[in-house]
């Protein structure tokens, strides 16, 4: 009985080796290394993620997804480096490479927009250079618009556009972008929080005479009617 159990255990172990070993083996093609890079990046292992993407490029130097992966991982890792701006500039260069190979990827355009935002914020917050910051912020918006032109129903692109618009003081347009996200994906992460904030800021940026135009018109009409009634009554007496 014990011998049978031992044999069954060996067979089960052999089956596990056959089934599971490919999952633990190094990828053998560029697509596999890109997938590995994505998993490592999502797990926060940026150094290993970058190495995986570089391995993909060794196998396929014109792999647009690998270049976009490098752009993404460098953008995420910039705050942990000794020269954040240089790291973000390298991310932007990798984005250039990716889009030169495949300009029809909405994911790559969204990634580019996020890189441009981080560079702009660095110029604004660290270097106190609002003019250069605004240049990058506007380029960021262009990138998100490119993503939307390729995929009009991409909720992530619309969300980032809404965030970008509010960041440059165009919250009324930002509200419209967030409402588009709401129509596409009501459960999009942090949507309601950002929509509420955008609506609040849009109320501040809208002049009161526009914000309350309806009420003002009704008040003017009421006053006009009262004045007409007053003069009509006065003439009788």
Per-segment meaning from a language model:
Residues 42-43, 76-77, 118, 125, ...:
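Register position in tetratricopeptide repeats
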